[in-house]
């Protein structure tokens, strides 16, 4: 027992050290950006430096009412601007900052997740079902999650009471910091300043935090519990196989919808219509699934971080996975922003408004041509 406690204490100290290193790196990247970057990106110059006639030249989808109405030249503009804005917005450094706050929010989020799940399931069931997360995390990093799950469950049976509710609310509030970091990053991508007040901003971020916990519980139930229930029904082998395979595309659709909701409602701006955020959401979903698989394969076969970093190896691998995931999410948002930036038509929800009065930088300006 003492050995296990010592091992868990060592991992906690290692993770704290990793957080400190990442925080310093993010601060340095923010204070000392690459001086080779342009002083002003295409967004800043598209309306002030380019004549309106040039900006609205035909054949580029300037009057498209959906992404499908944008021709090839327009998509070339979109891809070039997306590439430029990844540098202009210092996407990699911003993602590193999000990871720092995400790591601080990780343990409270796990606590909220496990505490909620433990209300309806025993300790063994919770451990078995939570283990499905190991299929998405890089090799060796799931042990960090496992240790925190064991720590929460070691407190005994969860019962709905004042103490439990207070602890759960505290955990959700702590995890809320990570969500606010994502919202801040999405504001950067959309060239927006936070205009919502303290209470409105926290209400939005808390809604996304609670929604994330509920979505994870739903995913666990869908991926783990549904096959168990189906096995009790006694379906034919072919039907059972089809359902077991089909749960993964269904999970991808859930992720796509979650990203679309995040892209639409998280930034401080008038929300875009669904059609303008669908492509970025789909690209981010597919890229994340492929990227997670490739990263897991690399870490399992080539990336032996425990040799280089010792006890920090698992934490470093987890950080890299979180960084990759954040970059993918922000890339999807960047792509959506530039798709919306291509048209002069109103891309926001509600009644159409003239350009300049739509309450969103990407809808109120027109992107540069290449």
Residue ranges and their predicted role:
Residues 2-370:
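Membrane-embedded alpha-helices and immediately adjacent juxtamembrane helical segments
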């Amino acid at each position: 027992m003492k050995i296990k406690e010592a091992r868990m204490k060592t991992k906690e100290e290692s993770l704290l050290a990793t957080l400190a290193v990442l925080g310093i790196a993010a601060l340095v990247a923010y204070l000392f950006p690459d001086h080779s970057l342009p002083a002003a990106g295409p967004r800043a110059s598209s309306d002030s430096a380019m004549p309106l006639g040039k900006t609205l030249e035909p054949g580029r989808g300037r009057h498209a009412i959906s992404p499908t109405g944008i021709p090839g030249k327009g998509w070339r503009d979109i891809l070039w601007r997306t590439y430029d804005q990844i540098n202009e917005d210092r996407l990699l450094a911003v993602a590193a900052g999000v990871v720092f706050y995400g790591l601080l929010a990780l343990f409270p989020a796990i606590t909220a997740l496990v505490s909620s799940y433990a209300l309806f399931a025993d300790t063994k069931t919770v451990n078995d079902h939570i283990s499905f997360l190991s299929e998405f995390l890089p090799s060796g990093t799931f042990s960090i999650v496992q240790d925190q799950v064991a720590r929460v469950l070691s407190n005994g049976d969860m019962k709905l009471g004042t103490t439990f509710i207070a602890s759960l609310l505290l955990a959700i509030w702590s995890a809320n910091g990570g969500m606010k970091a994502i919202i801040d990053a999405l504001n950067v991508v959309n060239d927006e300043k936070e205009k919502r007040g303290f209470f409105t901003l926290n209400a939005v971020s808390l809604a996304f935090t609670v929604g994330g916990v509920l979505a994870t519980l739903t995913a666990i139930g869908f991926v783990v519990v549904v096959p168990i229930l189906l096995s009790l029904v006694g379906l034919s082998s072919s039907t059972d196989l089809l359902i077991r395979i089909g749960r993964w595309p269904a999970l991808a659709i859930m992720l796509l919808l979650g990203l679309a909701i995040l892209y639409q409602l998280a930034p401080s701006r008038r929300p875009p219509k669904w059609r303008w955020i669908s492509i970025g959401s789909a690209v981010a979903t597919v890229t994340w699934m492929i990227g997670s698989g490739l990263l897991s394969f690399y870490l399992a076969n080539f990336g032996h971080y425990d040799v280089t970093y010792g006890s920090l190896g698992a934490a470093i691998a987890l950080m890299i996975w979180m960084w990759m995931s954040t970059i993918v999410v922000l890339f999807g948002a960047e792509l959506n922003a530039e798709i919306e930036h291509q048209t002069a038509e109103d891309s926001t929800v509600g009644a159409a408004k003239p350009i300049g009065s739509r309450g969103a930088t990407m809808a109120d300006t027109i992107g540069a041509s290449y």
